[in-house]
Swiss-Prot record:
Transmembrane segments: none
Protein known as: Sphingoid long chain base kinase 4
Organism: Saccharomyces cerevisiae (strain ATCC 204508 / S288c) (Baker's yeast)
CC terms in the record's Gene Ontology section: cell periphery; cortical endoplasmic reticulum; cytoplasm; endoplasmic reticulum; endoplasmic reticulum membrane; Golgi apparatus; Golgi membrane; intracellular membrane-bounded organelle
InterPro entries: ATP-NAD_kinase_N, Diacylglycerol_kinase_cat_dom, Lipid_Phosphate_FormReg, NAD/diacylglycerol_kinase_sf
Gene Ontology MF term list: ATP binding; D-erythro-sphingosine kinase activity
Record-listed ATP binding positions: 234-236, 266, 298, 324-326, 392, 398, 589-591
Protein origin, superkingdom: Eukaryota
Recorded topology in the membrane: Peripheral membrane protein
Region (Disordered) residue spans: 95-162
Function statement: Catalyzes the phosphorylation of the sphingoid long chain bases dihydrosphingosine (DHS or sphinganine) and phytosphingosine (PHS) to form dihydrosphingosine 1-phosphate (DHS-1P) and phytosphingosine 1-phosphate (PHS-1P) respectively. Involved in the biosynthesis of sphingolipids and ceramides. Required with LCB3 for an effective incorporation of DHS into ceramides through a phosphorylation-dephosphorylation cycle. Involved in heat-induced transient cell cycle arrest.
GO biological process: calcium-mediated signaling; sphingolipid metabolic process; sphingosine biosynthetic process
Main location: membrane
Subcellular localization, as worded in the UniProt entry: Cell membrane; Endoplasmic reticulum membrane; Late endosome membrane; Golgi apparatus membrane
């Protein structure tokens, strides 16, 4: 096959534009269906983990996907990797292109050695991009004639193949849909290289880097390439599927994007605390918890107990690959409950600092206070979370059943509550939210930014606001950041307010948190912000009739429950709660805590994590 029949492409500001001279995407009946090209373009540029549905916009099982449609743009946010192909190497039949150079290679299969208890995975390839959602299509061709070459191969512009001086033969790895997941695929392209200066025509100095490096730079613009990741897996967590979910769905994306991976499996309760406390932080820049929310809690507290905790929190980003029964961190930070899409967001996001909360109780305050990244709760929610552990195999539905049961019983949990307010009324809270919602915005933008001459579906600009540049410096934290402003050993400060005893003696729900979602479809804190220096507080009492409580609970998926007049919703800096019951518990990040006075305060910007677009998932609170 001659070179002119190979897929040819042009590097543009939006991505790699397919400009094959003689090939189009036909179905088996020889026709390019109306809407196919636009549908694929849309699905390549979006970032949701749902499936695309539109009139004529999805592919039937009979359709051939060996070729991309003419004028398809593979956006930079879809590209995972790129490398030069040496056309003289084995696989090109001594300089002749393979019989079908257009086929894509399915890279989602796991290694046969995946059941090793502790192993290291590394990939030398340079990485490239991020992504979002695709049409419902399972039968991407898994046969391949793609050339297997090492990443350091240089291009061979062989005259016999008709490759011109301004063209490079490049193997592109990018993310494509398969069912409900995203998987890496490879495609070999003959790319016409046009310099930045020539394309932009801005007069700026021309950078003489190669085409591959330019693709990588634009695909990972403002994000970290080649991450060194410690993946911690609880193989028995949730429904017991965490290991398989990571190996089959998340790992292929991480490996093909050039990440170096080591895997550690937890072997006993709270093992992740010990792993984080003892690990060599010089080997990693990211800890990815392939689990529910319990492992991130343990990792954060393990790092907190290190003698070099300042260095640990300055260097390491802690994130989640959703593989457990509760995946609030991934839903809030990566905007998805799907491990493959979360992995894609992981490699594309910029490190962002978020607030933590420090919890103190008499039984452990002289040992180590506990850090919390998600929430603390007392009352119905705590009982429903912890006391349904025996049916954890049911997944998130266990929590809903527990809440409904306790509400119907009309349980109340008397206590005393002292609060340091930041925004007491709902009106003050809304003002605070609007003033602070973009305070920490400064990370990679995945969403399209339309220009007058481009279709909004095809664009994926990676803009950054420099307001957080200093905040993300390597030495942002020092030991002072870990000192408590309100030690529990001291009396309650005078500027704290004691909540009305008529409310607290009839308390049903006491819930404080820092992330908008506490579980899938449970948007409990819609006004939560990553680093606004406050904790969200939600309270209800047992005097609310069941006829009113029912619609409140049914609106948790929308987050509109906080608008109901019976629901107290505030922003606070610290609080102390003193239970008046003899039996019960607290739940902190889903972990059982003793029933004794609990004091909590905000710890501003203590932890690095990875946020898609530099912010939490949009809860639409602004428009509520």
């Amino acid at each position: 096959m001659v070179v002119q029949k190979k897929l040819r492409a042009i590097l543009t500001d939006e991505g790699v534009l397919i400009k094959s001279q003689s090939h189009h995407m036909f179905n088996k009946h020889g026709q390019l269906r109306s809407g196919d090209s636009l549908s694929l373009l849309s699905c390549l540029s979006c970032l949701d983990d749902g499936t695309l549905s539109s009139d004529g916009g999805s592919f039937d099982e009979d359709d051939s996907l060996e070729l991309l449609p003419l004028n398809t743009t593979i956006p930079f946010n879809r590209i995972l990797n790129a490398k030069y192909v040496n056309v003289g190497q084995k696989g090109f039949n001594n300089g002749k292109i393979s019989s079908n150079p257009f086929q894509t290679e399915n890279l989602s299969s796991s290694s046969e050695n995946d059941d090793v208890e502790n192993h290291s995975l590394s990939n030398d390839k340079a990485p490239v991009s991020e992504s979002q959602s695709f049409p419902k299509k399972d039968k991407w061709d898994t046969k391949t004639n793609t050339v297997k070459v090492s990443p350091d191969d240089s291009q061979d512009n062989s005259p016999s193949l008709g490759i011109k001086d301004n063209q490079q033969l490049i193997e592109l790895t990018f993310a494509v849909p398969k069912g409900h997941d995203v998987i890496p695929q490879k495609l070999t392209l003959l790319i016409d290289h046009v310099s930045r200066k020539s394309r932009a025509n801005t007069g700026e100095e021309n950078i003489s880097s190669g085409t591959v490096e330019e693709i990588l730079e634009k695909s990972y613009e403002n994000s970290k390439r080649n991450r060194s990741i410690l993946v911690i897996i609880n193989p028995h967590g949730g429904k017991g599927t965490a290991k398989n979910l990571f190996l089959t769905k998340a790992r292929p994306i991480l490996v093909e994007s050039g990440c170096k991976i080591e895997i550690a499996y937890t072997k006993y309760a709270r093992h992740a605390i010990d792993i984080a406390k003892d690990l060599d932080i010089s080997k990693y820049d990211t800890i990815a918890c392939a689990s529910g929310d319990g492992i991130p809690y343990e990792v954060i507290n393990g790092l907190y107990r290190r003698p070099d905790r300042v260095d640990a929190f300055n260097k390491l980003a802690v994130t989640q690959l959703p593989c457990g029964s509760g995946n609030a961190m991934s839903i809030s930070c990566h905007w998805t409950n799907n491990p493959s899409y979360a992995a894609l967001c992981l490699v594309k996001s910029i490190e962002t600092r978020i607030d933590l909360m420090c919890c103190s109780q008499p039984s452990y305050m002289n040992e180590w206070p506990r850090l919390s990244f998600l929430s603390q709760t007392y009352g119905v929610i705590a009982e429903s979370d912890i006391n349904t552990e025996f049916i954890r195999w049911m997944g998130p539905v266990r929590f809903n059943l527990g809440v409904a049961f306790n509400i119907i019983q009309g349980k109340k949990y008397p206590c005393e509550v002292f609060v340091k307010y930041a925004a007491k009324s709902k009106k003050e809270l809304k003002v605070h939210f609007l003033e602070n919602k973009d305070k920490n915005k400064g990370c990679l933008t995945f969403e399209p930014n339309p220009s007058p001459n481009s279709s909004p579906d095809l664009l994926s600009k990676n803009n950054i606001n420099n307001s957080t540049k200093d905040e993300l410096s390597p030495n942002f934290l020092n030991e002072d950041n870990f000192k408590l402003k309100y030690p529990m050993t001291e009396p309650v400060p005078r500027d704290w307010e004691k909540m009305d005893s008529e409310l607290t003696d009839n308390l049903t729900i006491f819930y404080t948190g820092k992330m908008p979602y506490i579980a899938k479809d449970t948007k409990f804190f819609p006004a939560a912000l990553p680093a606004d220096g406050t904790i969200d507080l939600v309270i209800t009492d047992a005097r609310i009739p069941v006829t009113r409580m029912t619609p409140i609970l049914l609106s948790l998926d929308k987050g509109s429950h906080v608008l109901e007049p019976e629901v107290i919703h505030s922003k606070i800096l610290a609080y102390k709660i003193i239970p008046k019951v003899e039996s019960g518990l607290f739940s902190v990040d889903g972990e059982k805590f003793p029933l004794e006075p609990l004091q909590v305060e905000i710890m501003p910007m203590l932890c690095k994590t990875l946020l898609r677009n530099g912010r939490y998932i949009d809860t639409e609170f602004e428009s509520m």
